[in-house]
Amino acid sequence: MNLDHPKLVRLLRMAYSAEKAAAFAYIGHAGSVKHPDEKIAIKQIEMDEWGHRKTVLSIMRQYGIPVSWWNEVKYHLIGKTISLSCYVIGWFMPYYFAGRLESGNVCEYFVMMHYFNDLGITEHDDELYEMGIKEKEHEIYFQKSIENNRLLPLFEKIFGWGTANSFNDVDLGNKYSVKASKAYCQHRNK
């Protein structure tokens, strides 16, 4: 079955490649931190990203959606560049920008769910929900890691993400069910 939804196809192809960039970035991030608990947590996030990539590819294959080799090259280079930069930009910035990135990624999976549902397809709801919630958990991990850093207010003012601002409306303390989660990220569902 082919999907007649160009936005969904584009989002799936981008998410597949962007997960590789994120995983590569977390390899560098984990390597650059000194505390063993931080290394373990970031390594787990890296593994989650590889898992998301595998799940997205499975969905793409189900609908005959080819991988974008342009995205693969682009995001490969982005991920490797970020990975290397983690060793030179200090402790705060990798945490900040990882959290900011994860905040936006939350909605990618809920928007995919919306697009599939627009086509009458609900079979991917559970896995897309789980990936969106996992991205939110990643966002919260990075957010809590820097919440008391003196640079956070400045970065939040400049880049629009931090303890007071998120790019999604998911609240882990009051999670919606899979069915009700269709209310998430409506601001991005355009």
Q: What are the language-model segments listed below?
A:
Residues 1-190:
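Non-heme di-metal
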